[in-house]
């Protein structure tokens, strides 16, 4: 849920992970995080065997994530791939760069488009901090409601992790 941290900290507020552990047991672990304001799917492992197996898939980039976002502006349908470098800027915020930082690649598909807003699917090929937000900004279509580009009256931003696709270890199946 939006506003709930995936992982808590000692003596801090409750987290999604602590709530799942109450239901599924103390060994349950979140395999990734979402920003506090991002909604969507969170993948958990119920025991150490699955935690190791799924963590290995994340490390080997075998897990594909699909995000949906509502962005401000009419997305140019010719923009289906954004490849930049991402680094901390002098002001301490994350930003796109032509030469500094780590390589970041996202492919996009327009799901719906109007004059003021567009609905896009984002498939990150790398996992950099704020990658999709920054790539939407690079396309000239910031995600609605995000930080310094907040829309008047927007109380949240419109960005969700919609799906995962990955092979299921030990079973020889695919999930997603």
Named regions from a protein language model:
Residues 1-105, 111-114, 158:
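RNA pseudouridine synthases
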Residues 72, 122-125:
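A structural micro-motif recognizing beta-strand termini
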Residues 82-84, 120, 133:
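Beta-strand scaffold of nucleotide-dependent catalytic cores
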Residues 93-94, 118, 173:
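Hydrophobic residues embedded in beta-strands of well-ordered beta-sheets
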Residues 115-123:
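Short histidine-centered loop motifs in beta-beta connectors
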């Amino acid at each position: 849920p939006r506003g709930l941290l995936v992982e808590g900290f000692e003596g801090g507020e409750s987290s999604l992970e602590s709530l799942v552990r109450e239901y599924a047991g103390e060994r349950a672990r979140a395999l990734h995080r979402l920003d506090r304001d991002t909604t969507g799917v969170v993948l958990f492992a119920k025991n150490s065997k699955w935690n190791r197996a799924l963590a290995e898939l994340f490390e080997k980039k075998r897990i594909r994530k699909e995000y949906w976002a509502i962005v401000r502006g009419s997305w140019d349908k010719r923009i289906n791939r954004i490849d930049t470098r991402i680094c901390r800027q002098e002001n301490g915020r994350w930003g796109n760069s032509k030469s500094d930082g780590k390589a970041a690649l996202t492919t996009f598909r327009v799901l719906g488009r109007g004059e003021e807003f567009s609905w896009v699917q984002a498939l990150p090929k790398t996992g950099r901090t704020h990658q999709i937000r920054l790539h939407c900004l690079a396309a000239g279509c910031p995600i609605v409601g995000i930080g310094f580009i907040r829309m008047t009256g927007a109380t949240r931003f419109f960005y969700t992790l919609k799906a995962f696709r990955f092979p299921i270890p030990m079973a020889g199946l695919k999930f997603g």
